[in-house]
Each structure stands twice: as structure tokens, then as C-alpha cells.
């Protein structure tokens, strides 16, 4: 896949110094290559959240949608260039492909522009906890057993996102904050809630079986951090609806960052859900 070369403006040293440097940042489900990707918000997040290690936890590029219709605006190219520049500056970037960018799984063990490609990873926090890092689609029965249904669901989801963008354009004109229609609908549908619960419990159980204290995943576009059966389950959310990420502070504390809420509040200090050892 060829990307146009475009030089991003360098962040000022003053801006970089004013932001804390995190030990690790986890993001997933960017879905670059789709109109739903909130690339502008993501770029702003990356500028304010420098880190030692950055984990790209799957569905970074949406190969499913790009095969149907090419969509690659300059902002999406800027995100790729930003990631490559972070790698050049010494940030360790690990890419764990998901089902929408499963083509990258064939390149496990390779490095492109300083970005390592692995099908799963293990991250050890500063306080010694072992976190299993996976996208999570292997625990999705629809993906594994009825991929045609997954493609159908993807089309319906894309339609809901188009409606979501229209509604939020009206809300913006009225001075109202961003609101996710699809997230609201998922929260109201009992079957969707059962699916999420089953997914979370299955992922946590496998992490425990493998001897890890926690797991970081994506896939279901639902940011969460809670204990499940003695395992810390972390889902870093997505950059289509919620604009969320998981960060590790220098002392090993984990925090879910809700970037939309921070922007709405003027971005003064990190806020989110934290879990301490």
C-alpha cells in the first residue's frame, strides 16, 4: 500500500516538555481508510501523549473497507507519518494486527519503518504485572465461524456511523457535544450487552490460563477496565466512536483516557479511570 509523502510540522519542544511522558500507550480500532476514523482527534491525542512504548492493538487500517472503496484523505496519511516519526525518535512501536488488517499477520516478526509486527505481545508494567496484548477477534464467534455475517454486520455498522456523523453535525451547529448513536444503541440492546460480557469473560479466562495478571485488547469498540476472575481486563476502546486509549504511568498505574471528554473540558489535566497495583 503506497502512501503519499507529507511532512508534518514538528511539535515545539515547549509543547513536548509540558506533557507527561508515559511508559506505555495502547490504542486500537483506528480504522484508517474509513470516513468514520476520527484522525484529527487521534493526531491531537498523539501530540499530547508521548511514550516509551506504543502498542497498536489491531484494526489500525481497515482493509475490509478499502477493498470495497478507496478512501485515504491527507489526515489519515498524517497519522501514519506521525507514527513513523515517533518510531524514528526512539518510541518502541508494536503492531498487533486485527481482523480488519489481518493481511499484516503474514508479516509477523518483521519491522517496517521501526514498527514491529507481532500477532500477540506481552507487556510488563513498571510494577511487575504481565499484560497479554491481543486484538481479540479470535474470541469473536461471528468472526471465526460466520465471516460472511461479520461482513454484513460491518456494512450495517458503517451505515450507523454515517447516520451518527449527520446527527453530530447537527449537534455541533446547536453547540452540543459529541454523542455516539451506535454506542447508545449497543448499550440498549440486551443481546449486544450479552455479547460484550461473553467476550470479556472469555478473553480474561484465557489470559488467566496463560499465567498473565491482565489483558489488553480492542475489537468490540467498548473501552473498559475491570477485574474479571482475578484478571485485570483492559479494552482500550476505539477511534471511531469513543476516542479512548489506555496509558501506563511511570509508576505502573493504568488509566483509561477518554479523549473527547478531555477536549470538551479544555484539556487541562489527565482525567480517566485508574487502577493501581
Residue ranges and their predicted role:
Residues 2-3, 17-23, 34-126:
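Core catalytic region of metal-dependent phosphoesterases/phosphodiesterases
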Residues 3-4, 12, 238-277:
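Long, positively charged, glycine-interspersed low-complexity recognition regions
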Residues 23-31, 65-69, 184-191:
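Short, basic, glycine/proline-bearing loop/turn elements
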Residues 24-26, 54-56, 132, 216:
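Residue-level marker for buried hydrophobic side chains located in beta-strands
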Residues 29, 58-59, 98, 135, ...:
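Active-site glycine-centered loops adjacent to acidic/histidine catalytic or metal-binding residues
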Residues 65-67, 105-107, 143-144, 225-227, ...:
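Short glycine-/acidic-enriched loop or helix-start segments at secondary-structure transitions
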Residues 113-120, 132, 137, 141-151, ...:
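Conserved beta-sheet core of the metallophosphoesterase superfamily
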Residues 134-199:
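Active-site-proximal loop/helix segment associated with metal-binding centers of metalloenzymes
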Amino acid at each position: 500500500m503506497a502512501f503519499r509523502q507529507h511532512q508534518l510540522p514538528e511539535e515545539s519542544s515547549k509543547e513536548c516538555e509540558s506533557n507527561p511522558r508515559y511508559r506505555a500507550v495502547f490504542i486500537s480500532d483506528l480504522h484508517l481508510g474509513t470516513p468514520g476514523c476520527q484522525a484529527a482527534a487521534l493526531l491531537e491525542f498523539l501530540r499530547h501523549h508521548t511514550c516509551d512504548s506504543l502498542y497498536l492493538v489491531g484494526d489500525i487500517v481497515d482493509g475490509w473497507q478499502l477493498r470495497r472503496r478507496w478512501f485515504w484523505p491527507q489526515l489519515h496519511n498524517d497519522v501514519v507519518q506521525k507514527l513513523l516519526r515517533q518510531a524514528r525518535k526512539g518510541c518502541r512501536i508494536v503492531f498487533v494486527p486485527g481482523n480488519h488488517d489481518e493481511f499484516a499477520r503474514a508479516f509477523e516478526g518483521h519491522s517496517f519503518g521501526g514498527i514491529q509486527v507481532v500477532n500477540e505481545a506481552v507487556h510488563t508494567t513498571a510494577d511487575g504485572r504481565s499484560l497479554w496484548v491481543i486484538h481479540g477477534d479470535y474470541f469473536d464467534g461471528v468472526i471465526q465461524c460466520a465471516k460472511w455475517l461479520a461482513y454484513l454486520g460491518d456494512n450495517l455498522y458503517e451505515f450507523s456511523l454515517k447516520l451518527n456523523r449527520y446527527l453530530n453535525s447537527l449537534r455541533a451547529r446547536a453547540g452540543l457535544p459529541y454523542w455516539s448513536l451506535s454506542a447508545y444503541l449497543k448499550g440498549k440492546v440486551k443481546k449486544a450487552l450479552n455479547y460484550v460480557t461473553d467476550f470479556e469473560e472469555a478473553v480474561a479466562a484465557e489470559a488467566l490460563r496463560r499465567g498473565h495478571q491482565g489483558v489488553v485488547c480492542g475489537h468490540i469498540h467498548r473501552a473498559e477496565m475491570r477485574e474479571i476472575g482475578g484478571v485485570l481486563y483492559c479494552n482500550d476502546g476505539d477511534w471511531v466512536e469513543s476516542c479512548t486509549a489506555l496509558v501506563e504511568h511511570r509508576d505502573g498505574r493504568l488509566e483509561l483516557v477518554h479523549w473527547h471528554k478531555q477536549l470538551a473540558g479544555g484539556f487541562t489535566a489527565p482525567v480517566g479511570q485508574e487502577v493501581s497495583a
